[in-house]
């Protein structure tokens, strides 16, 4: 049989495979979502509230996180839009994990938990120290002292997870690569379509904030050489002399 010129619908939230072998993402906001939701539909919340202009025709409010703003026209092409949506969700999830990983060890260290190095951008260099990395004093993690071993584990484990996500599982069953469900949803958070639609919005809102936070952490590391919590403590102790403007006017790269 041939699929030429036809679109095969695989699952309610899965991509459509078209005859030209290109993928287009179907909307993930279920039709059963209440029309009263403030995050979906033509009457959804806009980026400037009541002062927002008319959104582009291709931003109809069917996807989570659509506030009707696309000055650069990045979402005008459906295929590019589908790809960017997937990239945003994946980067949001990594950013949320990364932001937690940057702050939590430093928080524990400031409360008496001993680390070899708690500041996120300095921790990796400890592998070159005489004692190597200190995983909370656990001697069973000796293999994590090897850069090659760490690299190999990252390639194998992350490659397997990404391959599983994109291919739809080890048996090749088709799932939504952004919201795979099934064994990835052991708590059944997606069972209620309306609750699931709201969770998608919350995930993107928190993910976008986390991406900005990670950008701020990188800038802080370059400019101050300190972790985020230490920078926060310095600012609270002396907000006049420890703020973005003060550092921007005195910052000399490389010094």
From Swiss-Prot:
Photoregulated by reversible phosphorylation of its threonine residues. The chain crosses the membrane at residues 89-109, 141-161, 209-229. Chlorophyll b 3 binds at residues 146, 162. GO terms for molecular function: chlorophyll binding; metal ion binding. Residues 1-25 form a transit peptide. The modification Phosphothreonine is found at residue 28. One of its GO terms (cellular component) is photosystem II. It is a multi-pass membrane protein. InterPro entries: Chloro_AB-bd_pln, Chloroa_b-bind. Chlorophyll a 4 binds at residue 206. Chlorophyll b 5 binds at residues 154, 251. Chlorophyll a 3 binds at residues 126, 136, 203. Pfam families: Chloroa_b-bind. Chlorophyll a 1 binds at residues 69, 75, 88, 208. Its main location: plastid. Chlorophyll b 4 binds at residues 154, 165. PANTHER family: CHLOROPHYLL A/B BINDING PROTEIN. The light-harvesting complex (LHC) functions as a light receptor, it captures and delivers excitation energy to photosystems with which it is closely associated. The N-terminus of the protein extends into the stroma where it is involved with adhesion of granal membranes and post-translational modifications; both are believed to mediate the distribution of excitation energy between photosystems I and II. Belongs to the light-harvesting chlorophyll a/b-binding (LHC) protein family. The LHC complex consists of chlorophyll a-b binding proteins. This is Chlorophyll a-b binding protein of LHCII type I, chloroplastic. It comes from Cucumis sativus.
């Amino acid at each position: 049989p041939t699929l030429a010129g036809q679109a095969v619908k695989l699952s309610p939230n899965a991509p459509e495979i078209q005859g030209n072998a290109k993928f287009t993402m179907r909307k993930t906001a279920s039709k059963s979502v209440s029309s009263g939701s403030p995050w979906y539909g033509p009457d959804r919340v806009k980026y400037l509230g009541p002062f927002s202009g008319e959104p582009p025709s291709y931003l109809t409010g069917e996807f989570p996180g659509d506030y009707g703003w696309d000055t650069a026209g990045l979402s005008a092409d459906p295929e590019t839009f589908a790809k960017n949506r997937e990239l945003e969700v994946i980067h949001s999830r990594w950013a949320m994990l990364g932001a937690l990983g940057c702050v939590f060890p430093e928080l524990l260290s400031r409360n008496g938990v001993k680390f070899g190095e708690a500041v996120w951008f300095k921790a990796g260099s400890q592998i070159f120290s005489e004692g190597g990395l200190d995983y909370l004093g656990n001697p069973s993690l000796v293999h994590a002292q090897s850069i090659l071993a760490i690299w190999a584990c990252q390639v194998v484990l992350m490659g397997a997870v990404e391959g599983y996500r994109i291919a739809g599982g080890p048996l090749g069953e088709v799932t939504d690569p952004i919201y795979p469900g099934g064994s990835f949803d052991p708590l059944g958070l997606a069972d209620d379509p309306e609750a699931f639609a709201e969770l998608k919005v919350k995930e993107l809102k928190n993910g976008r904030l986390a991406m900005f936070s990670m950008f701020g952490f990188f800038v802080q590391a370059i400019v101050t050489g300190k972790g985020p919590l230490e920078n926060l403590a310095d600012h609270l102790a002396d907000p006049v002399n420890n703020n973005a403007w003060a550092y921007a006017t005195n910052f000399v790269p490389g010094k």
